[in-house]
Amino acid sequence: MLRWLRGFVLPTAACQGAEPPTRYETLFQALDRNGDGVVDIRELQEGLKSLGIPLGQDAEEKIFTTGDVNKDGKLDFEEFMKYLKDHEKKMKLAFKSLDKNNDGKIEASEIVQSLQTLGLTISEQQAELILQSIDADGTMTVDWNEWRDYFLFNPVADIEEIIRFWKHSTGIDIGDSLTIPDEFTEEERKSGQWWRQLLAGGIAGAVSRTSTAPLDRLKVMMQVHGSKSMNIFGGFRQMIKEGGVRSLWRGNGTNVIKIAPETAVKFWVYEQYKKLLTEEGQKIGTFERFISGSMAGATAQTFIYPMEVMKTRLAVGKTGQYSGIYDCAKKILKYEGFGAFYKGYVPNLLGIIPYAGIDLAVYELLKSHWLDNFAKDSVNPGVLVLLGCGALSSTCGQLASYPLALVRTRMQAQAMLEGAPQLNMVGLFRRIISKEGLPGLYRGITPNFMKVLPAVGISYVVYENMKQTLGVTQK
């Protein structure tokens, strides 16, 4: 179909100069099915589908947002031609940015190199699979004509947008703070897109955490009290009986407030650690990204850890025990001293390595599997695949680090339990295993897993809508 498109609508001579209007007119007439001189979105959808032209996600809506100058919901020929010409200029710039050796062709090695600039590492074999989805003549290289034909109606703006699909970031927030920070391109930094994306992610995290707060508090209660008899329904009944429905959100305020300082610190120190681990001009690899991200997570956790302790104390506390965050901090300082704000800090720090490492490794494994087996017609995996990979990799990371998270939570709260010995990390591990067995180290993991799917869905929807509101993406 791409060969037909090149021969019938976009001849090879087009790469040498401006396209004759009659060529655009031929395509316009093919799309204008009722012959009324304009193309509406339904005609565009049906026409492009019947022509077999590759489309990006929500491509038709984006084309109309950009091309429909008078906002009448239809494209006349002048608007149609102007959109294609403007879009082709952007695609020419994208092609040149990929064509590193300026030979007029894109090769697999150049795709690998360009992906690395976005912090995404793939093999040469995987790059060849991507190349095959664009290559129309089987030469295993992509020239300008093939490139233009493939992205003719795919309304991406530049090469970074084209290959950004597999960045390990989709606005997912499942309530954990140990993930490796996002990578931002130079253009995103200069344009200010980076802080808008961080803000969108922060708002999405706040909404997601608030929506799943009852499950999070239940998890904390099961971790701290460690009772085999406390199941999910019994736990909810007990919390509602003790403090009413509002008590299900106890501790959520602190959990939301800490998003902003933690994100800011993690992002800033991540950039500093990357500079320390890589030479100037060198692109960061997966290993350096893992080390930098883990160190950034540890630094951010050190900075906001007192809020983690207060979140646990508020969640476990009884009605009337604390009037709010300030009252909780004041009582901890008065009765236990400043050191109490860092109880459980060591297991929390140790949990960062297995969580971040396994999260990143599983995501890379899933990405490689998809590229090897399914990247035949498009490099874009789609929203469901991205969300699924992100959720699954985070879940695997949680499984590995959960025992450390449980011990951390108990150390944070053990001063509140009457008659409970004040044990260190090793002592708590021994006590849990001797009294509850190995399953005791995973107490509360069921509600933790139950919140993953709603958290992923809510945070993604809010994140995408906030990006539109903040001007990161077009509506």
Swiss-Prot record:
Q: Give a GO cellular-component term.
A: mitochondrial inner membrane
Protein's UniProt name: Mitochondrial adenyl nucleotide antiporter SLC25A24
Keywords from the named record = Acetylation, Antiport, Calcium, Membrane, Metal-binding, Mitochondrion, Mitochondrion inner membrane, Peroxisome, Repeat, Transmembrane, Transmembrane helix, Transport
Q: Which GO terms describe its biological process?
A: adenine nucleotide transport; cellular response to calcium ion; mitochondrial ATP transmembrane transport
What's its catalytic activity?
Mg(2+)(out) + phosphate(in) + ATP(out) = Mg(2+)(in) + phosphate(out) + ATP(in); ADP(out) + phosphate(in) + H(+)(out) = ADP(in) + phosphate(out) + H(+)(in); AMP(out) + phosphate(in) = AMP(in) + phosphate(out); phosphate(in) + ATP(out) + 2 H(+)(out) = phosphate(out) + ATP(in) + 2 H(+)(in)
- Tell me which residues bind Ca(2+) 2: 68, 70, 72, 74, 79
Q: Give the species this sequence originates from.
A: Oryctolagus cuniculus (Rabbit)
Where in the numbering of this chain does the EF-hand domain appear? 19-54, 55-88, 86-121, 122-157
Which family is it part of? Belongs to the mitochondrial carrier (TC 2.A.29) family.
Question: Which organs or tissues contain this protein?
Answer: Mainly expressed in colon. Also expressed in the small intestine proximal to the ileum. Weakly expressed in kidney but not in the liver.
**Where on this chain does Ca(2+) 4 bind?**
135, 137, 139, 141, 146
GO terms (molecular function) for this protein are: adenine nucleotide transmembrane transporter activity; ADP:phosphate antiporter activity; ATP:phosphate antiporter activity; calcium ion binding
Q: Which residues lie on this side of the membrane: Mitochondrial matrix?
A: 216-250, 308-343, 405-443
Q: What is its main location?
A: mitochondrion
N6-succinyllysine PTM sites in chain numbering: 318, 435
User: What regulation of activity is recorded for this protein?
Assistant: Activated by an increase in cytosolic calcium levels that induce a conformational change of the N-terminal regulatory domain, uncapping the channel and allowing transport. Inhibited by bathophenanthroline, mersalyl, p-hydroxymercuribenzoate, bromcresol purple and tannic acid.
